[in-house]
């Protein structure tokens, strides 16, 4: 049966007057001897809101606070919790010591609450199926106050150079018999990390830190002692390709080299078939990652050039889908990716060539008319139970905070579906005109967005030559790429049309998790008939923050940021989400969000074979690649003062060197240096 919250009446609110703010914050950092690091934190709760809800099991009251999320076992009373991801040094044991807190008991009847606290429900799938209402009666007959442990921290694994832990604070306990709660407020506690191996922690940062992951690092609470700073690291790019695609990929490999990537290509025929293939390729990637060299740093990106028949994916561990995740999850024992991945999914050259051509045209800014980059198409599809509470605010959040005229966008085609199959022709027409970004959230199928419908046939007839968007489908199974051609693959395979990237799921996605994926973790209040978006200051970061605040985060990075929002939550589907979301397209490509601006770049226009470095003046943070004869001579990021000395190696005796400078939302600069 579908969970329907009907007849909603706001019962009241409880102001916690002695609260010292609301939410979680870091108070201080301390480093001691014997590898000890202590981070003192506080958690306060200033207000609780209540509203009544009718369910198949009778009347309940939902209790929530905007800065907090929902915790508890499914079917048991849903109580506020707050969660964070924290970096932990390698080798350290860690624990929490609670130093102080205030407590206050409240009779909920005094605040208009006369029914039981609403039982926590799992998120509903986006496949249109009915979600059963879960109610564990045994959780409502206990005497005394019950709830989650006040503080909890657990190791969740390693992402790139960061060992991560998940912190949960549960400040409310509930007595269902007496209809009372206890609030633990102004909690001060310490996260104590002992016996840290700081040498290994520094070495992991030195060997594995990558600008491709810099935005993800900002989503984590990092102790001061672990803030080693950014490195001017050359980025590394691995391509795993079917051997039949070698010649077609040559211009793509040359361009990535010119941009400043250390590119390595490995061909799929050396890894066998079936399970032997996935095991062999994973071992190859793991070895490359775990044994970085100056010539080949640990790869930041892996591109699979071939479909699932040519480069098989893994079987998912959480359901019956396939997944590329375990090629990227290098660290044993966890499911967090250490590399950003994407696919040029193709069974033959006719499917591969458009993906290469569109990517090169896009990255080189070879548009006849770039004005389409000012345009966006946003669609909240239809579902009678979830569109208004989840789909509408998802889209409205993007418009309110990022995709608007104040940020330079001009034509923002927005469709908030209030019924089935609305505006289908208009949506297709808007995409056909050209857009920099397209986002759909609702139901999907392996061959379409479901409602409003947008099918593979629509993609193939768009005719949006030279006006290719980056597309995200927050919906079910549009990247079910074990099929001959799924919806996500079609966007990339379309010749002279389609998209330069598509992010979607290889299995069912879910309403709550997709909402967090896009806008960041927050309390979802349902119903929300007007689709009011959450306040930005009340949410954690999600994919939209990575897009617009990530300073050049790649398309694969957007996907990772969305999954990290789910990882921070109390969802039971974290590993599942890492498994199902995939990028079709180049993982290093960075979407132009609005028309980019030209950069001012200067350098000496002549060198010789004995030259060991070239000074380049360019915008701070831009990336400089210098190459000759499709060989990388040197690459570096421009310093804050607007210049960088790019160290060179193996300069040829004569000819020309190519200088390529790229930056976030900037037109790429391409110039030449004479070699005398």
Q: What are these model-derived regions, one by one?
A:
Residues 321, 325-362, 446-536:
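Catalytic cores of nucleophile-dependent amide-cleaving enzymes
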Residues 590-620:
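Surface beta-strand/loop "capping" patches
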Residues 638-648:
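Glycine-centered loop-to-beta-strand initiation motif
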Residues 654-664:
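Short, aromatic- and glycine-rich surface loops/edge beta-strands on solvent-exposed regions
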């Amino acid at each position: 049966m579908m969970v329907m919250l009907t007849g909603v009446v706001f019962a009241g609110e409880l102001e916690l007057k002695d609260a010292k703010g609301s939410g979680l914050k870091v108070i201080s950092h301390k480093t001691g001897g014997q590898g000890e690091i202590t981070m003192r934190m506080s958690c306060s709760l200033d207000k609780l809101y209540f509203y009544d809800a009718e369910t198949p099991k009778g009347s309940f009251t939902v209790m929530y606070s905007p800065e907090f999320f929902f915790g508890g076992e499914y079917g048991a009373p849903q109580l506020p919790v707050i969660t964070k991801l924290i970096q932990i040094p390698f080798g350290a044991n860690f624990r929490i010591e609670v130093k102080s807190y205030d407590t206050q008991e409240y009779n909920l009847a005094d605040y208009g609450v006369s029914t039981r606290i609403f039982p926590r429900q799992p998120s509903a799938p986006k496949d249109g199926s009915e979600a059963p209402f879960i109610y564990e009666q045994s959780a409502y007959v206990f005497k005394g106050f019950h709830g989650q442990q006040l503080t909890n921290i657990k190791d969740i694994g390693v992402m790139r150079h960061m060992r991560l832990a998940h912190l949960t604070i549960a400040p409310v306990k509930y007595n269902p018999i007496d209809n009372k709660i206890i609030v633990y407020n102004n909690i001060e506690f310490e996260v104590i990390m002992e016996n840290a191996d700081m040498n290994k922690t520094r070495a992991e940062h030195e060997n594995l830190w990558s600008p491709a992951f810099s935005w993800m690092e900002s989503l984590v609470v990092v102790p001061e002692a672990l803030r080693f700073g950014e490195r001017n690291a050359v980025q590394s790019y691995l391509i795993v390709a079917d051997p039949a695609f070698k010649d077609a990929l040559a211009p793509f490999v040359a361009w990535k080299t010119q941009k400043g990537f250390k590119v390595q290509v490995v061909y799929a025929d050396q890894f066998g078939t079936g399970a032997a293939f996935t095991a062999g390729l994973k071992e190859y990637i793991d070895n490359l990652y775990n044994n970085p060299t100056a010539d080949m740093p640990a790869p930041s990106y892996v591109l699979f050039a071939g479909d699932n028949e040519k480069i098989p994916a893994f079987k998912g561990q959480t359901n019956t889908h396939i997944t590329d995740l375990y090629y990227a999850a290098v660290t044993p024992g966890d499911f967090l990716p250490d590399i950003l991945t994407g696919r040029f999914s193709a069974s033959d050259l006719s499917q591969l060539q458009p993906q290469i051509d569109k990517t090169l045209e896009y990255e080189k800014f070879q548009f006849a008319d770039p004005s389409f980059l000012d345009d966006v198409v946003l669609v909240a599809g239809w579902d009678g139970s979830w569109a208004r509470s989840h789909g509408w605010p998802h889209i409205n959040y993007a418009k309110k905070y990022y995709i608007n005229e104040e940020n330079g966008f001009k034509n923002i085609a927005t469709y908030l579906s209030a019924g089935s199959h609305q505006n289908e022709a208009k949506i297709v027409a808007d995409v056909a005109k050209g857009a920099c970004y397209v986002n759909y959230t609702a139901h999907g199928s392996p061959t379409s967005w479901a409602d409003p419908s947008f099918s593979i046939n629509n993609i193939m007839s768009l005719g949006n030559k030279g006006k290719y968007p980056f597309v995200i489908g927050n919906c079910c199974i549009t990247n079910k790429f074990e099929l001959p051609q799924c919806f996500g693959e079609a966007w990339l395979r379309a010749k002279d049309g389609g998209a330069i990237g598509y992010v979607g799921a290889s299995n069912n996605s879910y309403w709550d998790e997709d909402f967090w994926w896009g806008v960041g973790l927050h309390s979802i209040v349902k119903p929300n008939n007007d689709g009011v978006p959450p306040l930005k200051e009340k949410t954690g970061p999600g994919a939209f923050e990575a897009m617009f605040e990530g300073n050049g985060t790649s398309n694969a990075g957007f996907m990772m940021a969305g999954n990290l929002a789910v990882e921070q939550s109390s969802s039971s589907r974290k590993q599942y989400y890492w498994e199902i979301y995939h990028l079709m397209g180049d993982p290093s490509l960075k979407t132009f969000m609005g028309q980019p601006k030209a950069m001012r770049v200067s350098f000496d226009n002549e060198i010789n074979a004995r030259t060991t470095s070239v000074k380049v003046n360019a915008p701070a943070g831009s990336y400089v690649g210098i190459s000759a004869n499709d060989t990388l001579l040197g690459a570096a990021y421009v310093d804050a003062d607007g210049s960088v000395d790019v160290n060179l190696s193996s300069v040829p005796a004569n000819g020309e060197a190519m200088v390529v400078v790229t930056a976030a939302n900037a037109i790429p600069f391409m110039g030449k240096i004479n070699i005398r």
